[in-house]
Amino acid sequence: MSDFLNHLHIDGQRYAYIDLHKLLTPAQLHRLPYSLRILLENIARCAPVSLPAVLSRATGQGPDCEVPFQPNRLMFHDTTCLPALADFAGMRDVVAELGGDPTAVNPAIPAVLTIDHSVIVEHYAEAGAVEANLDIDFRRNSERYRFIKWAQASLDNFKVIPPGTGIIHQMNMESIAQVVWESPAADGGVLLHPDCMVATDSHTPMINAIGVLGWGVGGLEGQAAMLGEPVPIPFPQVVGIRVSNALRPGVTATDLALTVTELLRRRSMVGKFVEFTGPGLASLSWAARGTVANMAPEYGATVVFFPLMTRLCLTLN
């Protein structure tokens, strides 16, 4: 990986990063969609043994290949995380029985559990309905919540967003995503790289709205990622959508999202990346982009990607 590194300085701090100009010619890089640039950076950083095949496919010179995507974090909702936590508890028991240190058994990458699937609406249209429903949920699922509380207190790299806080893809965008991730570099410095993630929720592509590459996976894939395994996908075909103008007054982001959904449902989009481009993107807020990206599962796309732009960076600041 060191062959692909370059460095930059921000406020006197030296940072390393993967320089794609060391992998592709300027013309090749210019033609490559931004979503594939992030995917390529991920392979160069995490799975360089697969880089020749991925580079060959990315430049149109090689056959289809598998991409061993390595997320730097993942998110679960409560219905898919409990089996993973039970496995970690079991592994810790076995390690302890064999005389090892059970506290050494932890998620390999940061994992966040969002509890948003268990609350049942029994009180509504009344003051205090939210609190009443949460109280019933805590009493009904007390054993499960005790187990989750143990996991949060015992496991490194594991955090819990409690019920009543927000749904998983909302919390991902508003509170968890970093857009640019910092990791330890081999020389003891700091390596900057794109925030890449997966989550066990079909609407995870909503995070693509702020330039974070991520998509939904099944529970078993999530558990494998929690153990440091890659999430393999076929090298994706990218479908571009050019936005040439701003929305007219009275036309909402929901109108745009439904129109895009109607258009793409007429085509085979399963397993493909959709990427937005064009001068009209500058007029779309991060919330509008999120509304569009959230609809990815409605037409089968893996990713609905919006490149990071100056306006969004100002919003993040």
Regions found by a protein language model. Give the residues of each.
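Fe-S-dependent hydro-lyases/dehydratases of central metabolism
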Residues: 1-317
